Structure formats: structure tokens, C-alpha cells
Amino acid sequence: IPGFFPTPTSIAEEMVRQAGISTGMRVLEPSAGSGSIADVIREQCPGADLSVIEYNLTLQDLLKVKGHNLVGDDFFSVDGQQWDRIVQNPPFENLQDVDHVRWAFDHLADGGRLVSVMGESPFFRSDAKAAEFRAWLDDQVYDVVDLEAGAFAASGTGVKARIVVIDKE
């Protein structure tokens, strides 16, 4: 599947640890892919109310077979809902990760937490979109977990990435 790079289990486990998910929390994985992150959430946080979104029909079928609660196929069309935790590995190409992070943050409940893999581009590019994102991020309560070079090599890409953890107060 073009542009699909599943989250390695070790990274998904770190993301779920960073998310601090408790029983009863509403949790969303909005770029669910094959369910790499959602599988870890379900395994480590069985009391969470977990929902997933995925646009690819083949991957939707896989998520359904795995028993995940598929609530939509378009990340940006799910309005009027808020989640306590959003854990995601969105596409990086053309700064799509910036769009996904901003949308996800807007759909967090007060006191919620977003944990997202992001590419390096938003943190060093000089174009307006990247600069605006950095300025926005500086106004948030956030932390960064750097990932080793080659962290996604097993998934077929050498892109450097990091985990960004943002709390909504």
C-alpha cells in the first residue's frame, strides 16, 4: 500500500506508555493502518473505550477482523467528538503530520493528551506552515521523545521521526 509504513511494536509500546491511558478513557487511533498502535492499546489498556479511523478499504477489513471499533474512514470529517487520548502515526509527506496533529489537538477533551509520531520536517523547514506549527507548539504543554535513526527501517522507510506528546489543559 503506497505511503503506508506500519508503526513498529517497540514504538507503539512507547507511545502507549507516554499516553497514560486509564480504564474508561475515550481513546482514538485516527490513522489506524493495520492496527499496530490500536493492538498495543487494546492489549495494555483493556478498559479503554478505543475507536479507530482508517481510509484504506483493505486495512479497514483487517481492523474489523481484528475486532477494532472502526468509527470512520476520514480523519478530518469526524466532528463534534472529543477524546481523552489520541495516539497516532499520521502520514508525513507534504507536512500532513502537522495537519493531523493540529486536528487531533482540537478534538481532545480538556485534560486530554495527544501522542503522535511526526517527521523531522516540521521542526526545521523554513516555510510558513512549518514555522507556524513551531510557534503553535511553543504555546502548548508538550514533550518530545527522539527516535533513533532507522526506527522505521523494518517498515520500509529510513525517514527520521520523533514522538510528540501534547497535553490540552
Describe every region a protein language model picked out.
Residues 1-169:
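Class I S-adenosyl-L-methionine-dependent methyltransferase catalytic core
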